[in-house]
Amino acid sequence: MAESRPELRLLQLVPEPLPTHRPDVRVLFGDILPQHGILCDLIGRPGDTPEGGRLRREFSFFMLCLRQLLAANRRQYFAVQVRDMALLGVVARIICAFKGMPLFYWMSFLFAESRIVRAASADEPLGRLRRIALAVYGRLEHFALYRLVLPACRHVFVQSSAMARHVAVHGVPEDKMTAVPMGVDLDRILDPAIVAQRLPQWPDQPVIAYLGSLDTLRRLDALIDMLKILHQRGRENVRLLLIGDGSCAADTDFLREQARQSGLEQAMHITGWLPGAQAWALLKGADIAISPIPRGPLLDVSSPTKLLEYLALGMPCIGNDSPDQAEVLKASGAGLLCRLTPTELAERAIELLDNLPAARVRAASGLDYIRQQRSYSVLGARLAAVYRRLAGESA
């Protein structure tokens, strides 16, 4: 144990299937916090595919959470924490109030706002009934979260200081919130067994890599437009590697069609979803990495992981002025910052590709920054201190 203090145990309800690949759940609560005497009982959906329809599975998960909440008590847990489930948070509020147990809420994304935006967007391929259902659910979730759950919580954990400001607009005091940004699991990403790998069809071409979600919300067509500009400026040998997948086939179909219309089918490759080690190997084999985060109310409050992984690997990288990654790039000095326009992305890519040795020297400082500020070891120690303070206040 990293500390000799008494152990504290937290009951946390999460929407993810367990075991989960999400490092902010798996690493923080499964590996790091126990080293500081903070133990967590995680309640999530089954990791395999259970029998029955979706409604039956959702009801089964709800009943599992309800049973755990009803069985919980102050002798066993110092608090209950609900992650990203506003409607279940209402139930937890009632039960915790009855039992005199502190309730925490963890917000990793603005899910209610996202559903409202998607329902109103003409870009979303939704039928009329599904669009109405999504809008109604989003509004209901928004009301439950900001009117019923968060005001009753002892503490709220958010992804960024920008998200804290967003939540504060709805009446939650900022001193009642703690920002826990995304981090990097350095033990995994720096595994010596992960060796740089290049696609066989691009053995010598300069490769720009992107690692992450390919959802339409990410507006990755800007990268295809960037690639088109690079080719127009005499960089016909530059290739674009998209490491990841979309939520549905329409996301990747859209990107492939954009590339086809621009005559870039052979200059772009989508890997689909890959295990972490395989994805990092391809990333390490690229020449530069890029992290475009569209600006807007939803993603401006996010804490992107991809840029942090680029820095941990010492990759020459480009990131746009999304608040969290702009802060990271300015503080680390390890990459280039620009606005999210195809022209500026292309200009920064040329700047790096024309002087890769200097870019690699600058990028090497990224790992030190991650170790000091954004490793899960550091974030976990800070989070453990917050939990101990909260446990002391509620004792």
Q: What are the roles of these predicted feature ranges?
A:
Residues 162, 183:
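Carbohydrate-associated surface elements
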Residues 20, 218, 277-281, 289-308, ...:
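Nucleotide-sugar-dependent
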Residues 243-244, 252-281:
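Nucleotide-activated donor-binding/catalytic signature segment of Leloir-type glycosyltransferases, i.e.
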Residues 200-227, 241:
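Conserved donor-binding/catalytic core segment of Leloir-type glycosyltransferases
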Residues 70-88, 99-105:
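Short N-terminal targeting/anchoring amphipathic segment
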Residues 66-70, 94-98, 109-112, 126-156:
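Membrane-proximal helix-turn-helix segments that form the acceptor-binding/catalytic region
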Residues 331-343, 351-357:
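Conserved acidic donor-binding segment of nucleotide-sugar-dependent glycosyltransferases
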Residues 351, 358-373, 384-385:
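A short, well-ordered alpha-helix in the C-terminal region of glycosyltransferases
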